[in-house]
């Protein structure tokens, strides 16, 4: 009945989501991962790394605007921003929208992914790699954080999921979050992508619980990302601000004053929606006591 090729993405050991592939555009292997650019029937171009869809042309803006803007809009004129991961360049694109930003340092471990993105994901990065404020570093984010002498107003963690035995696991631990806090300015904060409350609620809750041991103000936001086929979670942390406390009028005023260009997903109403977390998820994260550590790092189920 259905003769096309399928991309099967396992969400748990017992569940997968299938996307029909129109064609494989490019496939490369690096020292670290397998990278595919495919054209999906429903979502168009899709970046797939190690079997996991990272983003698609049809809805990448939902994920990237939700990751970046609630934190940056809650801070007072962020000038120096650090991004770990984010190889597509779309997180960089959104951070550079802020009029106050003077420098965005982006650290990604894989030069193949960066070259791949520059050449093939123009709709994602929109030239952000060539912005004079961009400081692109190919390297290990963990090592960079340990060695940098700079302080940042905001840190954005656009990392791959903490799959069991992957290098990313150590970037979701209390030790690493303390290292990050040491390079954040007193008026700053961070945000991390936090996997899916739909498929890995325990993981989401443990990341939240872990950040609560490091920062005074921690809030969870969620939104539906169609190509991920589920809710996606983001956790924002700071000692001085909490984006969940801002209302739609404050958000809309700040966007008008501080942000260049036109956003497709995020505005005041969407901001309030992000923080309307369902009761069962609120109860889960508030009651979670487990903490991710180097000795026992959090992991997704698949």
UniProtKB/Swiss-Prot annotation:
Record-listed E.C. numbers: 2.5.1.16
PABS domain boundaries: 4-239
Q: Which GO terms describe its molecular function?
A: spermidine synthase activity; thermospermine synthase activity
Give the Gene3D superfamilies listed for this entry.
Spermidine synthase, tetramerisation domain (2.30.140.10), Vaccinia Virus protein VP39 (3.40.50.150)
Q: Name one GO cellular component term.
A: cytoplasm
Q: In which pathway does it act?
A: Amine and polyamine biosynthesis; spermidine biosynthesis; spermidine from putrescine: step 1/1
- What's an example Gene Ontology biological process for this entry? spermidine biosynthetic process
Q: So what family is this one in?
A: Belongs to the spermidine/spermine synthase family.
Q: What is this protein called?
A: Polyamine aminopropyltransferase
Q: Which organism is it from?
A: Sulfolobus acidocaldarius (strain ATCC 33909 / DSM 639 / JCM 8929 / NBRC 15157 / NCIMB 11770)
Lineage per the UniProt record: Archaea, Thermoproteota, Thermoprotei, Sulfolobales, Sulfolobaceae
Q: Which gene encodes it?
A: speE
């Amino acid at each position: 009945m259905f003769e096309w090729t399928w991309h099967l993405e396992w969400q748990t050991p017992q569940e997968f989501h299938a996307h029909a592939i129109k064609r494989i555009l490019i496939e490369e292997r690096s020292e670290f991962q397998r990278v595919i650019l495919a054209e999906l029937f429903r979502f168009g171009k899709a970046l797939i790394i190690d079997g996991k869809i990272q983003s698609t042309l049809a809805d990448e803006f939902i994920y990237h605007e939700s990751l970046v803007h609630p934190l940056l809009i809650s801070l007072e004129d962020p000038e120096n921003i650090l991004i770990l991961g984010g190889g597509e360049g779309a997180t960089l694109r959104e951070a550079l929208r802020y009029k106050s930003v003077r420098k965005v340092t982006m650290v990604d471990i894989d030069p193949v992914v960066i070259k791949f993105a520059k050449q093939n994901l123009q709709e994602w990065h929109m030239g952000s790699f060539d912005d004079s404020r961009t400081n692109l570093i190919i390297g290990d984010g963990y090592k960079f954080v340990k060695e940098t002498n700079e302080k940042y107003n905001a840190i954005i963690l656009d990392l791959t999921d903490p799959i069991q035995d992957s290098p990313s696991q150590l970037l979701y631990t209390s030790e690493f979050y303390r290292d990050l806090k040491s390079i954040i300015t007193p008026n700053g904060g961070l945000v991390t992508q936090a996997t899916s409350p739909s498929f890995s609620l325990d993981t989401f809750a443990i990341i939240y619980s872990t950040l609560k041991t490091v920062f005074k103000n921690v809030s969870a936001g969620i939104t539906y990302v169609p190509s991920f086929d589920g809710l996606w979670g983001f956790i924002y942390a700071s000692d001085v601000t909490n984006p969940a406390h801002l209302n739609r009028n404050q958000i809309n005023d700040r966007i008008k004053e501080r942000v260049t260009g036109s956003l497709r997903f995020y505005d005041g109403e969407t901001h309030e929606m992000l923080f309307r977390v369902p009761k069962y998820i609120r109860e889960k994260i508030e009651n979670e006591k487990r903490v991710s550590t180097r000795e026992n790092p959090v992991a997704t189920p698949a």
